[in-house]
C-alpha cells in the first residue's frame, strides 16, 4: 500500500509495508528518525491506498502515536523481519493507529463501500 502525509503544503506519498490490528485498531509502524514520523507529528492527517484484484481501498483519518512498548512489540511480532532493524525499546521504533477514520472500498464494477472506525 501507499501512505500519504503532508509536509507543509506539499503532499508526500511513499510505499509502506506494515499494517497490523492491535486492540481492535489499525496500526502502522515507522522509525522516529524518518521524515514520515516528523510529518505525522506535525500533521496527523494521513491516507493509505491499496489496489488488489480490481478493487482499491482508501483509508483516511488521523494517525495517533501509541507510545506503549506493548503496541510496538505487537507490531514487531507481526512482522518478524522488522526485528533486524527495530526493537520495541530502541528509542526509534514508533507505531501509530488510525483515529476518526473512513475506509472506502471502490471498483468500477460496484458502488463504493464506506466503513467508519
Where are these regions (language model features)?
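A short, Trp-centered hydrophobic/proline-enriched beta-strand micro-motif
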Residues: 1-8, 46-49
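General beta-strand recognition
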Residues: 2, 26-27, 58, 104
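Short glycine/serine/proline-enriched coil/turn segments at secondary-structure junctions
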Residues: 10, 54-55
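Short, surface-exposed beta-edge/turn micro-motifs
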Residues: 15, 24-26, 43-46, 91-95, ...
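A short mixed-secondary-structure module that forms the rim of ligand-binding clefts
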Residues: 19-54
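Charged, gly/pro-rich active-site loop segments
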Residues: 58-117
Amino acid at each position: 500500500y501507499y501512505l500519504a502525509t503532508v509536509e507543509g503544503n506539499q503532499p508526500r506519498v511513499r510505499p509502506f509495508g506494515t499494517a497490523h490490528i492491535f486492540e481492535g485498531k489499525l496500526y502502522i509502524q515507522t522509525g522516529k528518525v524518518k521524515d514520515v514520523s516528523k510529518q505525522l507529528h506535525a500533521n496527523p492527517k494521513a491516507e493509505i491506498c491499496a489496489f488488489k484484484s480490481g478493487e482499491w481501498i482508501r483509508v483516511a483519518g488521523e494517525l495517533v502515536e501509541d507510545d506503549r512498548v506493548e503496541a510496538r512489540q505487537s507490531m514487531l511480532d507481526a512482522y518478524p523481519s522488522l526485528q533486524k532493524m527495530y526493537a520495541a525499546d530502541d528509542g526509534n521504533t514508533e507505531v501509530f493507529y488510525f483515529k476518526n477514520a473512513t475506509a472506502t472500498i471502490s471498483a468500477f464494477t460496484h458502488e463504493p463501500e464506506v466503513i467508519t472506525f
